[in-house]
């Protein structure tokens, strides 16, 4: 089911960088943004708050790297913790999207294989956002998604 369009910040959370992408309030155009080099959470939060204010963000889409069987990986658990903490700090609802193979797909689609500048991470975040706009799930408050690891992220994958 397609979610209600709104201004979204999509995150492809990695250990070194966070790929970022946003969409307009109507969900028509998806734009990769400059990737964020990971630092302390408080420093990341300042940058992400600025993006949210500048873009009037109403929700977050966070990629969960599930395995081929749709099960959470160790990195998925890290992404979920980060996404929940960020959503709570920003007081924004969020949705999870299965990001299985999204980086590979972004590398193929945009000719960015092997990129280490962050462009590949943000291209993957853009694919996650396009997937969310097409398939959902609806955004939910962080506390409603906390107990359901991978909820809504098992379908599809990019």
UniProtKB/Swiss-Prot annotation:
One GO process term, biological-process aspect: rRNA 5'-end processing
Annotated localization: Cytoplasm
Region (Disordered): 138-158
Top EC class for this record: hydrolase
Matching Gene3D superfamilies: YqgF/RNase H-like domain
The entry's keywords: Cytoplasm, Hydrolase, Nuclease, Ribosome biogenesis
One Pfam family, short name: RuvX
GO molecular function terms listed in the Swiss-Prot or TrEMBL record: nuclease activity
CDD domains recorded: YqgF
Family matches, as InterPro entries: RNaseH-like_sf (IPR012337), YqgF (IPR005227), YqgF/RNaseH-like_dom (IPR006641), YqgF/RNaseH-like_dom_sf (IPR037027)
EC number: 3.1.-.-
GO cellular component term, pick one: cytosol
Protein's job: Could be a nuclease involved in processing of the 5'-end of pre-16S rRNA.
Family statement drawn from the similarity comment of this UniProt entry: Belongs to the YqgF nuclease family.
Descriptive protein name: Putative pre-16S rRNA nuclease
